[in-house]
């Protein structure tokens, strides 16, 4: 029987909720593009519950223990004396989330002699050193598309919040003020602005579709160009490189994976290409941006605003400059972990575990690494010959021999 080590974020400070704001969730049959939702044989939770925190356990305990497996759940993931470090030694399966990542570095993977599956409850497995997973024949899987729309909605919200100067205006109201001039002296209409996305995959394309009704000019850059029919439908302008797109955009949203080509792609030099007073929204990965360069750009006025929910490391230290830099709209990493999204990624996690334990194939779209090589979504997402090296440096990918 297997030991499953699950790393989840802490419960609410007031305790695990007994009631919720809504009684149910809207139902959808499939994702845009036709991919079906997760199809586990059963679930042991009510959709709409808090599943991503420690007490929620992704709704997995009953299923795992009834089949003879052991489940260890913790939020204590960092440092040599953490629960995660201690329990990893004999774990067969590690489950983590992008929002509260348990970094599977080469050293940790080498230490985990029994590890067979690294499962991301969500999208994005850059917290796993994929080369080490390849070398050790560890399967890496994630619940593709489970929260893509959740993130896309968050991006649109953040764009509007920055451009309309919503957060400082709300703060005036909260503090009892009525300082209209202070609110509107940094506020603009989104209409007719040029908005571009770096990457137009599931999330990037969903962002473009949601922005189209705002009568903006839409731009994108991506290795994989969208079909001509989609470009015409949304009146998209494609740019061969990021550097070509930056100068024409008032707003740039980052929706690409983290790998060697994209790490710190927003830096002092590339920020010089942006329009003065541009906005950046980053819900992809914190290391896409040079931390201090972003803060300097806001302080100098090069950028009019920066918003996102991704940091490095996560959780961010209390003195991280993105917490206090001017005109920021930062939140903890929450865009993809709404209660709606949790129901989907918990069900997808259950589906992957069922397939893994029963010896059935895991969906190709869920796979990142399998059989000592990049597989499925992983083979498509990462540049040929390269991928991310867990939480730190990237390594050249080579197939295990």
UniProtKB/Swiss-Prot annotation:
InterPro entries: D-isomer_2_OHA_DH_cat_dom, D-isomer_DH_CS, D-isomer_DH_CS1, D-isomer_DH_NAD-bd, FDH_NAD-dep, NAD(P)-bd_dom_sf. Catalyzes the NAD(+)-dependent oxidation of formate to carbon dioxide. Formate oxidation is the final step in the methanol oxidation pathway in methylotrophic microorganisms. Has a role in the detoxification of exogenous formate in non-methylotrophic organisms. Its EC number is 1.17.1.9. Substrate binds at residues 123, 147. The lineage of its organism: Bacteria, Pseudomonadati, Pseudomonadota. Keywords: Cytoplasm, NAD, Oxidoreductase. It comes from the Bacteria. The keyword Coiled coil does not apply. It comes from Pseudomonas sp. (strain 101). The record marks 285, 333 as: Important for catalytic activity. The keyword Cytoplasm applies. Homodimer. One of its GO terms (cellular component) is cytoplasm. GO terms for molecular function: formate dehydrogenase (NAD+) activity; NAD binding; oxidoreductase activity, acting on the CH-OH group of donors, NAD or NADP as acceptor. NAD(+) binds at residues 148, 202-203, 222, 257-261, 283, 309, 333-336, 381. Pfam families: 2-Hacid_dh, 2-Hacid_dh_C. It catalyses: formate + NAD(+) = CO2 + NADH. It is found in: Cytoplasm. This is Formate dehydrogenase.
């Amino acid at each position: 029987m297997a030991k499953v080590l699950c790393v989840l974020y802490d419960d609410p400070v007031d305790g695990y909720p007994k009631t919720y704001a809504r009684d149910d969730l809207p139902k959808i049959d499939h994702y845009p593009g036709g991919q079906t939702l997760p199809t586990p044989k059963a679930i042991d939770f009510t959709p709409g519950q808090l599943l991503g925190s420690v007490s929620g356990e992704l709704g997995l305990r009953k299923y795992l223990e009834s089949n003879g497996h052991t489940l260890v759940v913790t939020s204590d993931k960092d440092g040599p004396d953490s629960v995660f470090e201690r329990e990893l030694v004999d774990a067969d399966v590690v489950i983590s989330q992008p929002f509260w990542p348990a970094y599977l570095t080469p050293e940790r993977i080498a230490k985990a002699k029994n590890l067979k599956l690294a499962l991301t409850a969500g999208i994005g497995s850059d917290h796993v050193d994929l080369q080490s997973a390849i070398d050790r024949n560890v399967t890496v899987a994630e619940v593709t598309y489970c929260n893509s729309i959740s993130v896309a909605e968050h991006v649109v919200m953040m764009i509007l919040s920055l451009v309309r100067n919503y957060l400082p205006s709300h703060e005036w109201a909260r503090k009892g003020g009525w300082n209209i001039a202070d609110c509107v002296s940094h506020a603009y209409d989104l209409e007719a602005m040029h908005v571009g996305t770096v990457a137009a995959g599931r999330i990037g394309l969903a962002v473009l579709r949601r922005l189209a009704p705002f009568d903006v000019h839409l731009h994108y850059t991506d290795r994989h160009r969208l079909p001509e029919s989609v470009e015409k439908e949304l009146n998209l302008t494609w740019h061969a490189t990021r550097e070509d797109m930056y100068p024409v955009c008032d707003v740039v949203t980052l929706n690409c994976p983290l790998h060697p080509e994209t790490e710190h792609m927003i830096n002092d030099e590339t920020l010089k290409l942006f329009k003065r007073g541009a906005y950046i929204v980053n819900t992809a990965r914190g290391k896409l941006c040079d931390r201090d360069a972003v803060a300097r750009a806001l302080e100098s006025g090069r950028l009019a605003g920066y918003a996102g929910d991704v940091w490095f490391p996560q959780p961010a230290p209390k003195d991280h400059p993105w917490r206090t830099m001017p005109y920021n709209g930062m939140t903890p990493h929450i865009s993809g972990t709404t209660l709606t999204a949790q129901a989907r990624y918990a069900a997808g996690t259950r589906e992957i575990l069922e397939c893994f334990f029963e010896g059935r194939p895991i969906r190709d779209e869920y796979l990142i690494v399998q059989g000592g090589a990049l597989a499925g979504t992983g083979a498509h997402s990462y540049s040929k010959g390269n991928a991310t090296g867990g939480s730190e440096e990237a390594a050249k990918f080579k197939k295990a021999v």
